[in-house]
Amino acid sequence: MSSMANEFLSGIDRDWSAERSVVLRYRNCLRFESSAGDDEELKNLFLRTSISEGLRIAPLLVYRDVEILVLDETSLMRTHTLKSIDGAVSIARSLQRGYQRIAFESGGNTGTALTVYGSRLGLETFLVVPSENLSLLDSTDFADPNAHLIAVRDREHVKKVASELREREGLPKVPQPEWRLEASNFIGSFLLEAMLEGLQIDCLVQTISAAFAPIGIFRVLRQQRSELHRLPRFLGVQQAPNCPMYQALKGDEAAGEVSTGDQLLTRVMYDSTPQTYGTVDELRRILEETEGDLVLVDSRDFDRLLGGDFGGAGILDVLAAAGVDIFVREGEIVETTGLLALTGA
């Protein structure tokens, strides 16, 4: 094993399991600041902000002779989505900068995580969210009197309202794009440890919006490319009703081949301009170096997955048997991004 791989493995804090907190397990495997003192300060703040940011890999099923494993990013997370990692990272970054009041826009997942993690440490939070997404939220996450929730009827105006709020109140914009990538580095570290220990991943499938997750993951994996010999092929999935990254990389004509409508398949991915974060070129690089691809799914594809027969069981039952908690509130699937990834696969 190479010296770089050994250095990574020796940096793992084995007092913390990955199922408990990938933030604390891998914090010393990553470098966040050029200054050693600033880097140590941030890592010490992670000890304060971390609650529960657990990941695990579970066998799901064999479909057409392909073994499908699920990266469970929900069951062991404080807020039931991978955005719990963003909560731990962004609130640590906010504390590092001395922020006491923060404002952010979100489809729900990131905003819930920032609210929960921020309120716990005394920050005043302002979440701007599309009003159609209110049913996805748990009111108990916003019980703190300093946790403010602002609903906007037209989802296309959410960013504008949040920007005006920050300007009027003198509030910082969080999370910054680099913080999102840092959060994804922890997912990459989890996958890297598994791969260095022998897990073979031929293809990594994820639902994407701005593609912060795959970019952060592949930044970590790329550093150990010589040890891994090859990177997993990346397959990015977008919902047909809102597919700006697909359009940016493949063109509007290609996107037009799929039937679209106004109803989003995953309402938390409401942003129609995620390419403005400047992530298109790095996503293109990942697709080129891994011989990957982007695909679209629509409501018909999604319905086929939900109604499909997998060895006599539905997909939600298969996931439950694997120990994966798909959060459902009042009969509605709250977290659909993982199911969209399965649909695209």
Where do the language-model regions lie?
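PLP-dependent amino-acid enzyme catalytic core
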Residues: 1-345
